[in-house]
Design a protein with these regions (language model features):
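Glycine-rich flexible loops
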Residues: 1-397
């Protein structure tokens, strides 16, 4: 395969990953081997929907060096480790897929995927934690490669890396990994409870009984449909079901849902917030009923959402205040408000909050749940806010 062909294949694979739901926005990365000494990989901080072949970067397997002005993915080191260990591997994808990410936050070092998933081998290994892009993470991947015979590795508190002799094989490994992780979580629950079958709601209810802390104060009540909104020059547009209502700041007409006061207070107290999305996903609702502070179980939560997300039962001003240092807040019993400077940012926050909630619930059923350390969480948050988010904005322009 020529370098140009490999670049075009990587661009197409990036689009396929987004469409499949295995990655979103700039998360994850894709590479293709072009020789015994080089591979091409997606650039750092670029939206997959805007990539062209000219944006894909050749990288040395030996020393990770590259040429040109476009910076390759910060995770190029884990790709190089795989190409070095497996000369037959031609394609690697790093994903933040849901159930593999959920399992990465659980107290599980490895698990047997079973005969239905032959591409995963006899054991799926969870590589030890390392901050994104670090030598520590590369060493963890190197160790995991020596343990597993399959085409997928879970990365602790992060996601997964899947690989194969072809693009198709790598994609199938990623798809199989997602199914195998979901199967494993359910099988463990059924085994613990000695049940023949169960559904996701049963798992959530069980986890909630283990997590919930009593709340004796006053609780707000917001009736569905919940509201989304976006800031305008003279207030904000409130989306209630299929209706869009213009609202002037500080002047809420009668008949608006009570949630409108929250949006008004948030925009008043947080000038950088331009969009608010309400997550009523079952996992977010369940965690919002637990009266806890949600901490990062996954790297992308620490980076994009914050070092903690509080549960607030109180008045609008308290809800708005909880967003001073985070991009989301849990509304007691009513899910989460997810905020951003753009519609895409708010959607990303919503997706990540929901995934982190699922990780907490499922992880609780599987053993002890340990968040990412406060130091590492703060470091990732600062780096993201000062560097990576600006890089994304610049690339959009």
């Amino acid at each position: 395969m020529t370098e140009q062909q490999a670049k075009e294949l990587v661009v197409a694979a990036g689009l396929r990953l987004v469409e499949s739901g295995l990655i979103a926005r700039t998360w994850g990365n894709v590479s293709c081997r072009i020789s015994d000494t080089q591979f091409v990989i997606t650039p750092s901080g670029r939206d997959y929907l805007s990539l062209a072949a000219a944006d894909i970067v050749p990288v040395s397997i030996d020393d990770l060096s590259y040429t040109g002005h476009i910076k390759p993915s910060g995770e190029r080191g884990i790709h190089a480790e795989i190409y070095r260990y497996h000369p037959e591997v031609q394609f690697v994808i790093h994903t933040h897929q849901e159930y593999a990410s959920v399992l990465s936050a659980a107290d599980v070092a490895q698990f047997a995927p079973g005969p239905n998933y032959p591409l995963l081998g006899g054991s799926v290994v969870c590589a030890a934690y390392g901050l994104p892009g670090t030598k520590t993470l590369r060493r963890s991947i190197r160790t995991a490669l020596q343990t597993t015979g399959g085409g997928a590795i879970i990365m602790k508190h992060h996601g997964a890396v899947c690989f194969g002799k072809t693009e198709e094989e790598a994609f199938l490994a990623a798809s199989d990994l997602e199914l195998a992780c979901r199967d494993y979580i359910m099988a463990r629950y059924l085994q613990q409870k000695q049940l023949p079958q169960a559904d996701d709601d049963q798992l959530r209810r069980c986890a909630l009984t283990m997590l919930a802390k009593p709340h004796s104060g006053k609780s707000n009540y917001f009736a569905p449909p919940y509201c989304n909104s976006e800031r305008t020059a003279d207030g904000f547009l409130l989306q209630v079901g299929d209706k869009q209502l213009k609202v002037a700041p500080g002047r809420l007409p009668a008949g608006l849902p009570p949630e409108a006061a929250l949006h008004d207070a948030i925009y008043k107290a947080n000038p950088d917030i331009q969009y608010i999305l309400h997550s009523d996903a079952p996992d977010a609702i369940a965690v919002s009923q637990a009266n806890l502070t949600l901490r990062p179980l996954l790297d992308d939560f620490a980076q994009i959402v914050g070092t903690q997300v509080k549960t607030v039962f109180g008045p609008p001003a308290k809800v708005a205040g909880a967003l001073k240092h985070a991009s989301a807040v849990l509304l007691g019993n009513h899910g989460a408000l997810c905020c951003g400077a753009t519609a895409g940012d708010a959607a990303a926050v919503k997706m990540i909050v929901e995934k982190n909630c699922k990780a907490l619930l499922c992880g609780t059923l599987l053993g002890k749940v340990t968040p990412i350390s406060k130091v590492d969480s703060l470091l990732m948050r600062v780096v993201y806010l000062k560097k990576y988010s600006k890089q994304i904005s610049a690339n959009k322009g």
